[in-house]
């Protein structure tokens, strides 16, 4: 490359797919480009438009969709005008975000933002080249579907389940309208099965396929009626809940609201303290470059929570409802308790609660590494379970409870384990006294004292 090379990179949103949905600005940028990079479906949009106009697409085309590969191609074409094409809009779950971050890392640092008549561009200075990034919006397929069915999307919850995992049941539970990108031929059915499992089968679902194309298809049914249907792998869906529930901001579900049977349950006041001690935080969604791994990672990832000895699932359900982005693994070996957990999960619509049946020490090795763990029962395998947890994540925060004297004595040895793993250790005793009616009077009745240990 010679001195003072100037490379223009257009990051273009191509809309839902039909060339009629391209903006005039996008067409102008594509016409100026000498190199065009993107997934084959996006490249085909521009090629078909050129054919309709009776001219050849004269650019050099590269079929690529991975940010690393695209960044390398851009560097190999220094001094040229490059168009990188993305489906939908570049600001809505688009690869444009990762690519711009990758370019900053690969070729240099941001020099300045330049305002001109065409909008705001970003300049990145490399050793001998200035890369000018020009961002051109497109029409999102989710926006297109909302408009097609005549629904405003300004007050909708917008998410993506394409290439990432989103807690769709929680979003649907708490919002009247949820628009989402999907990926995979069976994903609509899988999401609807999950909604039905957690008691949300009566939610209305609108599915859009091949949006903007001549064979566009829009289907509207209840979630429970879509569990076996197959849709295009790039389908878009809108979930409509006529009776959304307000989201809980603190624990404290009344004990009597749970289906209990004869299975022991962590009581309301203890649950509140345990959840506070766990100190769970939602992920920020902020993506940063990690020098050690050489990858872009979420700075504060979504919590992965174990509830060991989950019983009726009362703690798991409270946690699931509070941590919309996290996943709670409720681990229980007793069949009667597992049956109750399924019933309670359905009652409270806890879509991010995974029920794991089996002995904790046997199932933990196959689970994702936890960020937080509550141990309410351990089946006599406490130390083995602790070793497994710390092997998966030495920084996991663990809260344990004990009622019997035998378990309390066992917990005293945990101080040594905490010291060995260089984590904080704290133990408190909690005694709750509740009022109860005694004829025309009220009396205070003491509950069993509970020991609560926090490690980490």
Go through each PLM region and give its residues:
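Conserved SAM-binding loop
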Residues: 341-342
């Amino acid at each position: 490359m010679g001195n003072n090379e100037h490379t223009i990179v257009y990051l273009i949103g191509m809309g839902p797919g039909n060339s009629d949905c391209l903006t005039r600005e996008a067409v102008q940028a594509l016409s100026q480009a000498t190199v065009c990079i993107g997934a084959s479906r996006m490249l085909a949009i521009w090629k078909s438009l050129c054919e309709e106009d009776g001219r050849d697409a004269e650019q050099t085309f590269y079929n690529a969709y991975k940010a690393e590969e695209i960044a390398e191609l851009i560097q190999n074409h220094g001094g040229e005008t490059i168009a990188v094409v993305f489906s939908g809009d570049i600001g809505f779950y688009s690869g444009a975000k990762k690519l711009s971050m990758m370019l900053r890392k690969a070729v240099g640092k941001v020099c300045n933002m330049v305002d001109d008549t065409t909008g705001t561009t970003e300049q990145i200075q490399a050793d001998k080249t200035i890369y000018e990034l020009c961002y051109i919006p497109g029409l999102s397929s989710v926006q297109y579907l909302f408009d097609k069915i005549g629904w405003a999307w300004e007050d909708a919850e917008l998410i993506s389940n394409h290439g990432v995992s989103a807690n769709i049941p929680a979003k649907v539970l708490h919002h009247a309208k949820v628009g989402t990108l999907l990926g995979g031929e069976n994903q609509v059915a899988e999401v609807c099965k999950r909604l039905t499992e957690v008691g949300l089968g009566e939610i209305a679902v609108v599915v859009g396929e091949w949006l903007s194309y001549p064979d566009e298809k829009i289907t509207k049914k209840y979630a429970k009626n879509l569990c076996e249907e197959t849709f295009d792998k790039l389908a878009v869906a809108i979930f409509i809940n006529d009776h959304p529930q307000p989201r809980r901001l603190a624990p404290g579900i009344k004990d009597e609201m749970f289906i209990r049977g004869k299975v022991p349950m962590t009581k309301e006041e203890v649950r509140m303290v345990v959840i506070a001690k766990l100190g769970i935080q939602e992920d920020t969604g902020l993506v940063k470059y990690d020098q050690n791994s050489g990858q872009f990672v979420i700075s504060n990832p979504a919590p992965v929570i174990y509830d060991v000895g989950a019983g009726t699932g009362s703690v798991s359900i409270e946690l699931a409802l509070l941590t919309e982005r996290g996943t709670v693994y409720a681990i229980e070996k007793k069949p009667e308790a597992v049956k109750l957990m399924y019933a309670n999960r359905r009652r409270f619509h806890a879509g991010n609660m995974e029920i794991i049946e089996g002995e904790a020490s046997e199932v933990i090795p196959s689970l994702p590494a936890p960020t937080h763990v509550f141990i309410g029962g351990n089946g006599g395998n406490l130390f083995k379970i602790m070793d497994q947890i710390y092997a998966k994540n030495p920084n996991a925060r663990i809260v344990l409870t004990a009622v019997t004297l035998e378990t309390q004595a066992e917990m005293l040895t945990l101080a040594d384990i905490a010291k060995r793993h260089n984590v904080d250790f704290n133990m408190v005793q909690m005694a709750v006294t509740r009022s109860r009616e005694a004829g025309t009077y009220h009396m205070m009745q003491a509950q069993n004292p509970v020991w609560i240990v926090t490690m980490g």
